C-alpha cells in the first residue's frame, strides 16, 4: 500500500498577537507523524510536516492538491491529513450554508484581517476542503484528523484552567463577530459526503460543532487534548475499530475533565474497521 500524509501544526501566527498563539499544535503534527511511522507502516519520506511559518495557506493547499492528484492517478491508495490550529468562522462565501450563514475556516500561519472578517486568502474554508475531498477514486482511503474548532459558544470555565487555551479565534472586529455570532455551526459533515463514484473520507474531529477544542498541558509538554488522547489510544491498540477508538478518546477527554466531545464522521462500514483500513 502506497501511503502519504500531510501533518500541519500551527502555534505561531504572523499577524496575530502572541496572546492568540497556541502551544501544542506543532507537537500534534510531530506526534501524528511519529504514530504513522511506528504503527502504520509509513516511512519518513511518506510524510510532509508543515509547521508555523511553513504552513501558509498557499503551501498547505498546494501540498493537499498534489496529494489529491497523486491519488487520482493511482500512485497512492492511503492518505492521512492532520491539522492542528485555530478554527474560526467567516461570512458565507457562496450561499451554501442555509442554516448558519457562515463558513467554517481554519487559520493558517498568514491569517490576516480583511475588513471585518478574516481574509479568505489566509484561511482554509470548509468549502475548499470539501472540493478537494470530492471525486476521489474508490481505491483511495482518506483519513482527516482535525484538532481545531469553529465556535466559541461552548466555552466553559474548564477551558480556562491554567495550561489550557481554546483553539478558536473569533472574527477580528465586533461587527464581524455580529455577522456570525447568531450562526448555528453545523460541523464538517459535508467533508465526508464524497461522491457517488468515490469513497467518502473518514473524519475525526476534536469536538462537536458547538464546542471548543482545548490546547493543553500533558506530562511536561503541550498538545491538543484530542490529539493527545487519540495518539495514546492508537499506541495502546492500533487495530481497534474506529468506533472503539472514538470511545477510548472520549473516555480520555472525560478523565481529563475536558468539556469537548470527540466526533467521528464516516460511512457505517468504515466505523467497524481500524484506523488506516479500507472497508
Task: Put a short name on every predicted segment.
Residues 1-279:
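Cysteine endopeptidase catalytic domains of the caspase/legumain-like
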Amino acid at each position: 500500500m502506497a501511503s502519504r500524509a500531510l501533518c500541519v501544526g500551527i502555534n505561531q501566527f504572523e499577524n496575530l498577537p502572541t496572546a492568540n498563539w497556541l502551544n501544542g499544535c506543532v507537537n500534534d503534527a510531530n506526534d501524528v507523524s511519529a504514530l504513522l511511522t511506528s504503527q502504520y507502516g509509513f516511512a519518513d519520506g511518506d510524510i510532509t510536516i508543515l509547521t508555523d511559518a511553513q504552513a501558509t495557506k498557499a503551501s498547505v493547499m498546494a501540498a493537499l492538491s498534489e496529494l489529491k492528484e497523486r491519488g487520482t492517478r493511482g500512485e497512492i491508495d492511503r492518505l492521512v491529513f492532520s491539522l492542528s490550529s485555530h478554527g474560526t468562522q467567516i461570512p458565507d462565501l457562496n450561499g451554501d450554508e442555509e442554516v448558519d450563514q457562515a463558513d467554517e475556516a481554519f487559520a493558517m500561519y498568514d491569517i490576516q484581517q480583511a475588513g471585518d472578517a478574516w481574509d479568505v486568502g489566509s484561511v482554509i474554508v470548509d468549502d475548499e476542503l470539501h472540493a478537494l475531498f470530492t471525486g476521489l477514486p474508490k481505491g483511495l482511503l482518506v483519513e482527516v484528523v482535525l484538532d481545531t474548532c469553529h465556535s466559541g459558544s461552548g466555552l466553559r470555565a474548564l477551558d480556562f484552567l491554567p495550561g489550557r487555551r481554546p483553539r478558536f479565534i473569533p472574527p477580528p472586529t465586533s461587527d464581524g463577530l455580529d455577522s456570525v455570532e447568531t450562526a448555528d455551526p453545523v460541523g464538517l459533515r459535508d467533508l465526508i459526503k464524497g461522491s457517488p463514484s468515490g469513497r467518502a473520507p473518514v473524519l475525526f474531529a476534536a469536538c462537536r460543532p458547538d464546542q471548543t477544542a482545548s490546547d493543553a498541558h500533558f506530562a511536561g509538554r503541550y498538545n491538543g487534548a484530542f490529539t493527545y488522547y487519540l495518539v495514546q489510544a492508537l499506541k495502546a491498540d492500533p487495530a481497534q475499530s474506529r468506533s472503539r477508538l472514538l470511545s477510548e478518546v472520549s473516555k480520555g477527554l472525560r478523565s481529563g475533565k475536558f468539556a469537548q466531545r470527540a466526533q467521528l464522521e464516516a460511512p457505517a462500514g468504515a466505523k467497524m474497521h481500524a484506523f488506516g483500513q479500507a472497508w
